[in-house]
Amino acid sequence: MSELSRQLDLILRGVVEVIQRAELESKLVRSLKENRPLRVKAGFDPTAPDLHLGHTVLIHKLKHFQELGHQVIFLIGDFTGMIGDPTGQSETRVALSKEKVLENAKTYERQIFKILDPAKTLVEFNSRWMSPMTAEGLIHLSAHSSVARMLERDDFHKRYHEQKPISIHEFMYPLVQGYDSVALKSDVELGGTDQKFNLLMGRELQRDYGQEPQVVITMPLLEGTDGVKKMSKSAGNYIALEDSPNEMFGKLMSISDLLMLRYYELLTTEDLAGVKPAHPMEAKQALAALIVARYHGAEAGQQARVAFQQKFSEREFPAEPDVSLILTQADLREGQTISLVDLVAKTGLVPSKSEARRLIIQGGLEVDEQKQGDATAVLSMVPGKVYRLKIGRRKFALVEFSGS
């Protein structure tokens, strides 16, 4: 296999689209001939302090380029973060303050180096060239596109026809992202499929500014733990890189068997041919251990697996439950009793009494390994006795009545 073929095989693994494939091959040939690494960028707006597994689809593709000897640029969009990416939005996003954006950005460098080699990664902030830009410069930049062109975007087009407001500054977002490619002289830009319009804007602006246009590579969007929506903090379906090992393992074990295969494909280099014949539970545990090990170390991955097997697979009550609670007479009714609904609610492991009631009715409560399905039932508490509660599939509590 030639070096060109080897590089293409790794670069194209898991991608959705390359614009244009011939240009990518041409750039790689020139790179090999001149011994000049390609400049490959991917941008991330620090709208929240946590990076999650959804972000790592792009970061791992950056890693592929890095392994091939190219210069990867992790661009922190501290300037674009203050605009707010309108992609997929049905209304204008609330702009973040500069202080909040910078606060979030501080955690990004620490997190990305769980994957990328810090010695071979260029970290940039787009405020470096955007903040000094004058009003004249912004006018010049905005002259490179038109309102008609912006309305070709699906989200803008939909909002316009639904007579929902579109703020002028939102039109600036694709232009600023595109100008990032000009400022960095990027050869390749990576992004999710939902970023295609913005990525193509980079190609257009590079042409306008006399540069060779970048190749655009789009990557699939990773579904969150619900298996439906794109992984995001706002959707509550994300797995953060800085989740604890046990929390990360538990979230990964909660995904569907079908989504498990998707995670194997997008988040690992494992051969799917070897995964599909395996028992789903075993394959899922292997996936969870693999991902936990990547971000917390091999030992943490194995410990999380053992803890999960003890807590869920073997149905043993864990040595360290989620909550340990001591009730007093003031917490009980007359006769030293308490309703199951109140008992579950007092653990704090459900958000409300109504949720506790729903959980009990659906058979999601066990007291001392006995399933409870009557939401009107009461429990007689014996002073000094410790009651073991399993609440839902993954939460455990120890409750003791002090007797006073």
Give the role of each language-model region:
Residues 24-86, 190-196, 202:
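N-terminal catalytic cores of NTP/NDP-binding nucleotidyl/phosphoryl-transfer enzymes
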